[in-house]
Amino acid sequence: MNQEVMNLFNPQVPAQNFDSIRISIASPEKILSWSYGEIKKPETINYRTFKPERDGLFCARIFGPIKDYECLCGKYKRMKYKGIICEKCGVEVTLSRVRRERMGHIELAAPVAHIWFLKSLPSRISTLLDMTLKDVERVLYFENYIVTEPGLTALKEHQLLSEEEYMLAVDEYGEDQFTAMIGAEAIYEMLASMNLEKIAGDLRSELADTTSDLKQKKLMKRLKIVENFMESGNRPEWMIMKVVPVIPPDLRPLVPLDGGRFATSDLNDLYRRVINRNNRLKRLIELRAPGIIIRNEKRMLQESVDALFDNGRRGRVITGANKRPLKSLSDMLKGKQGRFRQNLLGKRVDYSGRSVIVTGPELKLHQCGLPKKMALELFKPFIYARLDAKGYSSTVKQAKKLVEKEKPEVWDILDEVIREHPVLLNRAPTLHRLGIQAFEPTLVEGKAIQLHPLVCTAFNADFDGDQMAVHVPLSLEAQLEARVLMMSTNNILHPANGAPIIVPSQDMVLGLYYLSILNQNEPGEGMAFSDLGELHHALESKVVTLHTKIRGRFKSVDEDGKPYSKIYETTPGRLLIGELLPKNGKVPFDICNQEMTKKNISKMIDTVYRHCGQKDTVIFCDRIMQLGFAHACRAGISFGKDDMVIPATKAKIVADTENLVKEYEQQYNDGLITQGEKYNKVVDAWGKATEKVAEEMMARIKAVEFDENTGRQKPMNSIYMMSHSGARGSPNQMRQLGGMRGLMAKPSGEIIETPIISNFKEGLTVNEYFNSTHGARKGLADTALKTANSGYLTRRLVDVAQDCIVTHVDCGTETGLTMTAIVDAGQVVASLGARILGRTALDDIDHPVTGERIVDAGKMILEPDVIEIEKAGIQSIRIRSALTCEIQTGVCSVCYGRDLARGTPVNMGEAVGVIAAQSIGEPGTQLTMRTFHLGGTATVVDQSFLEASYEGTVQIKNRNVLRNSEGSLVAMGRNMTVQILDERGVERSSQRVAYGSKLHVDEGDKVKRGQRLAEWDPYTRPMMTEVAGTVQFEDLVDGLSVLEATDESTGITKRQVIDWRSTPRGSDLKPAIVIKDASGNVAKLSRGGDARFLLSVDAILSVEPGTKVSQGDVLARSPLESAKTKDITGGLPRVAELFEARRPKDHAIIAEIDGTIRLGRDYKNKRRVIIEPAEDGVEPVEYLIPKGKPFHLQDGDYIEKGDYILDGNPAPHDILAIKGVEALASYLVNEIQEVYRLQGVVINDKHIEVIVRQMLQKVEITDAGDSTYIVGDNVDRIELEDVNDHLIEQGKKPAHGDPVLLGITKASLQTPSFISAASFQETTKVLTEAAIAGKTDGLQGLKENVIVGRLIPAGTGGTMTQIRRIATSRDELILEERRKGTGAAVATPMLQDMAEKAPAAE
């Protein structure tokens, strides 16, 4: 009752509706306008009376009463005196809530600089004054005077003077001839007297004249700050404070603890310091104290204000009583525990509970089991309301009692309340949106939440003690969204790749697999059954078994929906699965008339979903789960020790390999191969042996055996069934159980040469066990570290992509990406069909032979189209992509294509950026958590040959070959590609051939699929001569540039080039091998250069001086890096490196133009390479390459734009600059996909494209035109387009720019929204920049809206935003018409606008 009366007198303040938030610097006048009074005393509260001191930090006169409607002295109490100010204590009679919003101020006796503008790098104050930060600090902290007005003296403006110099100057010139000041007053004067317009003009003219890069950068930085001040209306002198605002007392509370002590916020301490020093300074000034004392006090005041705003930014950190640094205002905002991330983005919610989960196989997919106790607590308000409505109770208090006593009627009402009221279940860590799903609760006894087994994959949950949280959606809208969008039955497909995620796993798979096995010679083989009833009868009476080969009639419907039946050769088990299939012509019995491995089950569910829709799929999944569990239970598959079969041939394979290894040792001892080569070969040999043993073991386990007596097939090996069905375990783990464990990796990632020959069944020897512990421990350490890394990657991805939302239907762009199949080492790893499915065709797709249309331009490519396209043998297709979408904010539906989680075109308002970030980030954590599953077992992947992946005719591009002395064809070209053309002359595959490879085919040869095209040594890279002659060495000085390394164990010497630049004597050498012709002159190459081959560090010489060589002979070999194990451990940092667009350590150098290589004069330790352009009018380009890097080009080689001059990982920026956006996109997509593919994770390309789009938002101005930009400015792409449109309208010259690639962290910090950037990283820096520029945040992204507490502009919230936008534009239109006076504007109904969906692309 009381509350209701209160509400009558205090109408709730209506929620403010705003569209944007602006941040700027507060002027002293502004701070005073906020304030309710000045704080003069450092006292907080009176410790005897517990009343706040007057004019102190908690003063009730300034900030408001402590108790509602009661003044401090108690003269006025109650509501009737509302608004009266007590004449005795001066306190206004009002709500105590005002103590949360009323501010005070401290009037400073001397101005102080705001530390953010001083110390947040780059320092704004020093840049604006064009001084160094050190100098500004010297003035501010009273070390030096600064000349502000030199007058007619010889002093310069802004010259620093020490105390002595100042005194001398005063003596020399007299005190009134010049002005020199010290402290913040000096800086204040200088800032106040700045003429910004004049400075900007000067800077612009200076910029036009200057040529040096460094100077330009400096001038641009200063000009940017000057312009920011001019545009934002901020004054430079506001960066120096004369008044300090004091935040409301209830935001820095002082709480009494028991025992008469108090807990206080650190801010009170910091404020106290400021007030104390300020009061002391006032007193000193009044007393006319000596200058030095006043200066010292001013310095201390400056330091205390610094500590209040940002403790520890400058000088020592101010600590409290317990040596803990005090939390300043900046620390309140920063970091994970700061205001942004802790309270605004990470709110805790009411109406929630958590408990352990257990499996609930009898639940339907849309249900979950909720413990009664929990439900009673969660739904309390609903129960109270219902009790009241039904007349069981008349007050809330009564209802409370009924519920506490758990009366029977309460349970009935709980049932009613819960009915069709979905709840949300969430399992931490929530890595993607499937980590929170809605279910309908069913009440269960006990205290554990029951979870449906099929959703475990999505939650990544298991029942070994996992806990889950339950949340109750309260409002009708929330319940509706939970039901329509978040229900588990609506999340059948995985948003990352569009494959079903509601797929049976483990026991269920095993049961279904067991059901679908077909065995020979079972009872009743060959029987025929007319319908399923008969079959059930036969199974019950054991006439047939589940695995008998029978002929059975299966009834279904054809494509028109007419019933028909057909007889299949099948087994009773498979017919039982078929019985559950929905009746649909597109879902034939054939999809389950096979062994049901996990893959096949997934395909089956996918087919059912695509053709029968969601409802049928859900019912089908539930039934198939029941069937799987039932038969897994019946089959009783278990495994024992003898199921692990050790192949008989293992001993022989091991012995053979040991002999081979001995042979390699011998070769090494004889000096034929190097230590590195031996290592590589040994590791390779053991790798092959392990594979062989594994193959033998698999063959043994797979083998089908028959019982001699009955002739029936023996049951299959249990372990094989588990692994083959996909229920649990991998061939790799089986190999470790029954084959041999194989090679292990050291913690550093190198492989230990001695493998583990035993397996787990035989048991490991002590040495083997010790070797294996490295891998095991590394796995565990990695797991711990990588989880954090992966989480951080996800956070950065979400941050960069959060404002990418589908805002329009079609942007009508004419650009897109070209998609081809990805072929790796002759294997198609991603087919063209898989990559274009669910994307929009950019051009019409026609059959290359018949010319008939397969897909129209602008239409989505669906499953049937993919089949047609692959049949037609089309090699590449141009599709629309989010990367090339021309919408200004967000992307359009057509460019994005299919919504993978729904299988339909993407809806308006879908937050595709966040989905992309989650899809990429989620497997990162999964994989890192899985590292140790490999147990550090090494897998050696080294490619040493090229196979034909198709049948056809060979064509060699850039052919440059020689026949060597053995008569083999050797590739001498740097960029030769072997292409295979089909009979129509269409290119089917194209693969690069490494320099020095042996070719087995030549131009025009016919090849079969799988035929070897070329091979090479995977461990070394040869250097070969293309002319015959005699060898001569140049600059190969013993001990300086070449070392005769004698191998201790063998006594054989080999010559290896060493780093000749490490000694001063060798710095000018150019080690090379020269070929002389018969007359003793240097032989000439076919391209006109000399036959001089420059050597790189570590090259091993294969010839001696004076040796006669013929064409194609090897002169030297450069060893390649030894094999490291491939693990996502290398993968996660690689993904981060690509997304952060970092330059790799030894990055490739890419040719910027087509042309001929010329080697220029070398520098001390760099080699000059010049490309002479092929076409006229292009400048030659020069590169500097570190000597000693393997450099394979010769003088006169022809090189194409985009070819590598120096091998390595290319820097993404170079690809963008040289080859353009499309090449960059395909590089990043392929590289990132490769990491995930290694782990068998499927992610759709479009997710990576969305992130890359966000990385390409900025443009660097190359030609400013008539705009106000400066060359070299980084501008938002959208902003530039807008500015150019205006310029073109006015008939001026537009500005031009090149796209810039930013890493995801940088891109996040450069978003237009300062709120989003500040909540991500570097909070102070972001806010400082934004304040100076007077930035306005338009609240476009998701994050900013969450922070200010509005609905996000995506999904259902997006619709509201849209309606508001349309309404605003309507209002403007009507006002415009009224102004024109043409009467009311004819307004079409709002709905029509909605139907047209957001205005078309601008």
UniProtKB/Swiss-Prot annotation:
Family matches, as Pfam families: RNA_pol_Rpb1_1 (PF04997), RNA_pol_Rpb1_2 (PF00623), RNA_pol_Rpb1_3 (PF04983), RNA_pol_Rpb1_4 (PF05000), RNA_pol_Rpb1_5 (PF04998)
Cellular component terms (Gene Ontology): DNA-directed RNA polymerase complex
Leading EC class: transferase
Cofactor: Mg(2+); Zn(2+)
UniProt remark on cofactor binding: Binds 1 Mg(2+) ion per subunit. Binds 2 Zn(2+) ions per subunit.
The reaction(s) this protein catalyses: RNA(n) + a ribonucleoside 5'-triphosphate = RNA(n+1) + diphosphate
Record EC number: 2.7.7.6
SUPFAM superfamilies named in the record: beta and beta-prime subunits of DNA dependent RNA-polymerase (SSF64484)
Molecular-function annotations in GO: DNA binding; DNA-directed RNA polymerase activity; magnesium ion binding; zinc ion binding
CDD domains associated with the record: RNAP_beta'_C, RNAP_beta'_N
InterPro entries per the UniProt record, alphabetical: DNA-dir_RpoC_beta_prime, DNA-dir_RpoC_beta_prime_bact, RNA_pol_asu, RNA_pol_N, RNA_pol_Rpb1_1, RNA_pol_Rpb1_3, RNA_pol_Rpb1_3_sf, RNA_pol_Rpb1_4
Classification via NCBIfam families: rpoC_TIGR
Family that this chain belongs to: Belongs to the RNA polymerase beta' chain family.
Primary role: DNA-dependent RNA polymerase catalyzes the transcription of DNA into RNA using the four ribonucleoside triphosphates as substrates.
Quaternary structure, from the entry: The RNAP catalytic core consists of 2 alpha, 1 beta, 1 beta' and 1 omega subunit. When a sigma factor is associated with the core the holoenzyme is formed, which can initiate transcription.
Name by which UniProt lists this protein: DNA-directed RNA polymerase subunit beta'
